[in-house]
Amino acid sequence: MTKTWFALAGASALALFASGASAEEVTLQLKWVTQAQFAGYYVAQDQGFYEEEGLEVTIKPGGPDVAPAQVISGGGADVVVDWMPSALAAREKGLPLVNIAQPFKRSGMQLTCRNDSGVTATKDFPGHTLGVWFGGNEYPFFSWMSKLGIPTDGSPQGVTVLKQGFNVDPLLQKQAACISTMTYNEYWQVIDAGMKPEELTVFKYEDEGVATLEDGLYVIEDKLKDPAFVEKMAKFVRASMKGWKWAEENPDDAAMIVLDNDETGAQTEHHQKQMMGEIAKLTAGTDGTLDPADYERTVETLLTAGSDPVITKKPEGAWTHAVTDVAFK
């Protein structure tokens, strides 16, 4: 933690003590491990923005074995960071998750291809193996292939789908012509492994018109019936977005704050600074209020994801402006 954090935390604690108030507790469950993808929350904690709102926030890192929906369902968090496809799937299956804010305005999903595989345009996909993440991340891909009219059955006229792990080995080892990458993470792992940008062709889901909303904030619907909870979440969202804007303006400092909070020691300064620079492009230009048009595009993409769609009908009540209206009134 930085000296600034201790100073602000101390001042906030004194203010709370003097007023006779006690901090409201909030537990946030992240979608993945501690990294710059979640910088705004760590910055809000480090810079005292949560304390200024009278909040005591616990940030729980995620990982490959952590499903945010399961955590909040079991009472392990008040609010979670999740991608909208996962949240909508959980809602259709009976877990009433509601999006209360959308810090990520744009998607970071992309398909990164080796030029020497012969893939430099979407028309080149047939006959090749493409690496795809599953666990809910596959649906935009299948929607894209459906839009292109390309089968995913491994036929000569279609593509072979490789269930990709969370690494870039299939591309480096030529097991796949293309793999799934995030603009802020795996793409740079490919570059750091020795490949040059000019040796690669990148297809961004945003550009292909099949991007779905990624890191949003979700709560259990029933909780929103309590005005006190809505007010608490408004404070949390307001402070979190203040953290995100600070991170956009101070990307290197934000990356260092993330590193300070990485208890695993697995992250590196170089990678986190690189990541923060890309993340800032995804959060820029929004105060965290969900754009209904982005929501509709996400739903439409998911409903056209081939023979096994993540949702089977248009959701109802899956998002609200109740929190952001209070936060930014």
What are these regions (language model features)?
Residues 49-52, 148-154, 193-196, 264-265, ...:
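Short helix-capping segments at alpha-helix termini
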Residues 85-86, 166-263:
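Pocket-lining segment of extracytoplasmic ligand-binding domains
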Residues 1-9:
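Bacterial N-terminal signal peptides that target proteins for export
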Residues 25-165, 170-173, 177-184, 203, ...:
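Short, glycine-/small- and polar/acidic-enriched structural segments
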